[in-house]
Amino acid sequence: MQKQSDAVACIHEEITNKRNDYLHKVSTGIIKNHDFIGIEDLQVSNMLKNHNLAKAISEVSWSQFRKMLKYKAKWYGKQVVPVSKKFPSSQLCSSCGYRNKDVKTLVLRNWDCPTCGSQHDREMNASRNLEKKAIRLLTAGTAGLA
C-alpha cells in the first residue's frame, strides 16, 4: 500500500512541476514581449465556490499565473493592468463597440456583429477589448490620450 501511495505522490509532484514550469515559461514570455498586460480582474476564490468549475479552475492555477505575471512585471519594469470583472469584454464588438447581450452565455463561442458584420471568436474578441480597456485605464488623465 505504501508503494502505491508513493507512486501516486510522485505522479502528483511531476504534474505540479510541469504545470509550474509551463506557467513560468508562459508568464516570462508574455512579460518580456509586452510593455503592459491587461488582465481581467477575476475573483478566483469566488469562482471556486461553483462546484462545476472548481476543479478545472484550480487545476490551471489562474491565481498562481497572475502572481507570476505581477512579480515578473516588477522585475522587468512592465505593468499589469487589471480590468474590472464587470467589464463586458466578451459582449462588446471589438470593431465597432456594439454590445451583444446574447454572448453572456458561455455556450456561445462565436458570433457575428449585427452592426458591422465582424465575425468574432469569443476569447479573441474579449482579449482585444481587454487590451483597449487597459490602454484607456493606463492613459486616463493623460491629456489627449484617454
What are these regions (language model features)?
Residues M1-A146:
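Positively charged, helix-rich recognition surfaces that bind polyanionic ligands
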